Amino acid sequence: MKYVIMADGKGSRWNNYMGLTKHNIRIGGETLLERTVRLLHEYDAAAEVIITSHNTQLHIDGAERYEPKNNVLEIDRFTAELIGDNMCFLYGDVYYSEEAIKTIVQNAGAERLLFIGSHKSICAVLIKDGALFKSLYETIRSMYLDGRITECKGWQVYHLYAGLPLDSREIGRGYLITDSFTRDFNSPDDYNDFIAGQV
């Protein structure tokens, strides 16, 4: 299966903390991206891994770097030209446990669309039907540009798919809550809290 790790965000809240981009945080001797790529190959021998980034210095064994053609809005992390059938979007600023990656790989193809995460954060989107996901993505993007909604993220795509209010954090059909540990790093506080919990 094709896995696209989204690592082309602005990182404004992270603000180059410790002189690093979020994706270059090292935990247990490897960066977040190195860990995710390694685990994907461990649990899916046929994994094709793509990392979306304009950083020409980014080279991770086992992954190909791709420069998105359009990265204006936050929703554009879902690189439109890479959306297709039988694929998965993952987040480059997330620490994935082995169990989380195993859950993602094992649920490939289970539903037309399957969002995976906690009650607070989406950590993966499994796509069996690329045309459906692209339609939802384009609808949310258009609604945001027209001023009909105030946020334009993965949550809005999920809520449109599930028939839930677009401004909520409700969870319904097509969402798998994983108890497996994942942690996203949006700010220095996120990182420091995680490290303090490891000691």
For every predicted segment, state its role.
Residues K10, I50-L58:
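Short, polar loop motifs at secondary-structure junctions
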Residues E30-A46:
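A short, N-terminal amphipathic alpha-helix
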Residues M18-N24:
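Short alpha-helical oligomerization interface
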Residues K2-I5, L33, E48-V49:
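Hydrophobic targeting segments
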